[in-house]
Amino acid sequence: QYDANNNLIQNTNRSNEWVKYADDCMNRQVKETNQLNHATEYEYDLAGNQTAVIDGNKNKTVYTYDGLNRLVSKTNAEGGMFEYRYDSFGNTAGTTMYGGGDEKATTTYAYDAAGNLLTETSPLGSVTTYTHDKEGHVLTQVDENGKQTAYTYDKLYRMVSRKDADGTATFAYDKAGNMTSAKDGNGTVAFAFDALSRTTAVTNEDGTTTAYTYDAASNRLSITYPDGKAVTTAYDSLGNVKSQTDHDGTGITYTRDAEGRTIKEGHSDGSTTEYDYNAAGLLTLQKEVTKSNSTRRQTAYTYDDAGNIVSENRSGVDIDKKDELVRYYYDKANQLIRTNIEGKNTKYSYDLAGNLLSDGTNTYTYDLQNRLTSKTGKDGTTTYTYDAAGNLIKKAAPDGATEYTYTAQNKLKTGKTEDGQSSTYTYNALNARIKNVQVRDNKNAGHANSDLKDGSHGTDYLDFLMDGRFFWQRTWET
C-alpha cells in the first residue's frame, strides 16, 4: 500500500504478515513497525543524511557527517565509535576505531592523482603498497611482509598471469569471458561451460573431473564427483530446493510456506523436523519427530523487540526426557552479556570494538588490529603471535607451541608442533588447498590425527570444485 505521495506505508506478504512504514513531511522513512509491534525508528539531518537508527529496544546508533555529506563517525549505544577521514578528492584517507580509554586504532590510505590506492598503513605501522596501469588495474602489490605479487592482463583487462615468490600462475578464458584454465607449478585446473556460461565440468590437477548439470532455470540439478557418485537436487516452481539426494543415497525433502521458509524436513530414516515462525519471520519452534510419529525433542524460541533471542526452551518430549531453559541478555549494542541455563549464569564482556574480553571461563586480549593476542583460563595462558601481514605465526599454549609459515599469497603452508608433528599444505593456481601432508615422527600421541601412527605420514588429496568445496581422499603409510 502507498500513500498519496507514493510512499510505501504497508507491505503484506502472502502469509498475511505485514510491516507498516511511516514517513516525515519530506517523505523520509522514520519508522518501521512489524505485526508484533516491534519498531525501528530513523532520524535525519536537514540534508537528508540518516543521523540515527533506534532499534526495537530503544538502543540508538548515531551517525555524523561533514559539510559534503560524507560519513565521519558512527557511534553505537555502548559508546563504540568509528571515525572516517577523507582527502581533498573525496577518497577515504583514514579510519579510526576507538577502544577503551585513550586507545585507538587508525588505518590510513594514500592515493595517486587518478584515485588509485597507493599505500595502506595499518594501526601497527605495517604498509601495503600498490602500482597500477593507466586504466587503474593493479600491476604490483607488496604486502606488509615485503612479498611482491605482479599481475598482467589481456586486452579485455582480464588477469592472465600472477607472479610471486612461489612462481607464476597463468589464466585463460573463452570468448564469453569464462575462465577455462588456471595453471601453476602444481598443475592445471580446467573448466568447461555450456552455451549459458554455466560450469559443466571441473578437471583438477590429477586429471579427475567433477561434472554439473542444470535445469532450464539454471538451478543446479546434479554434481557428479570423481568417484562417480552424485548429489542430485530438485526444485519447486519458485526455485526453492524441494529435495536433495546425497552421494550415499540418503536424502532430504523440504516443505515450505508461502514465503519460501522451510516448515518441514523429511529425512531418509523416516524422521522429520518441523519449524514454526512468528509474524516477523523468526523461528519460534523446532520439533524433531521420529518415524513412529513420536516427538523426540523440541526447542521453542522467544525474542525481544530488536529480534534478539531472549529464551530457548529445550524439551525432550517422548524419548529424550530432559528439559532445559536458556535465557539470554544483551547490552545496548545487542551483544550477548549473560546466559542463564537452569539458574546458572555465565557473563560475557566486550571492549568498545566488540571483541570478547571474558566469557566466564577465559579472558582475552587483543592488539590494535583486533587480533587475539592471549587467552587465559584455568589451565594457563595461550599467546598468539602474528607477522606484519596478520598471519598467525605462533600459538604458545601451556602444553606446547605450534608455529606456522605461509605462501607468497599468505595461505597457510606449514604447521609444526614442538613434538615434531607437522602438516604441509599445497595450493593450486586459484589458491584452493589441494593437498595436506601430515607427518608424525616420534612417540608422543598428544595431537595426532587418530588414523596416523607413530613414525608415519599421511596425505589428504583435495580436488577443487567450482562451488568452493572439495572432493577429498586420504592415503597413509608407515
What are these regions (language model features)?
Residues 1-13, 17-34, 38-55, 59-76, ...:
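Beta-strand elements of repeat-based all-beta scaffolds
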Residues 466:
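Carboxylate/His-rich catalytic cores and anion/metal-binding grooves
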Residues 461-463:
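Short Gly/aromatic-enriched secondary-structure transition segments
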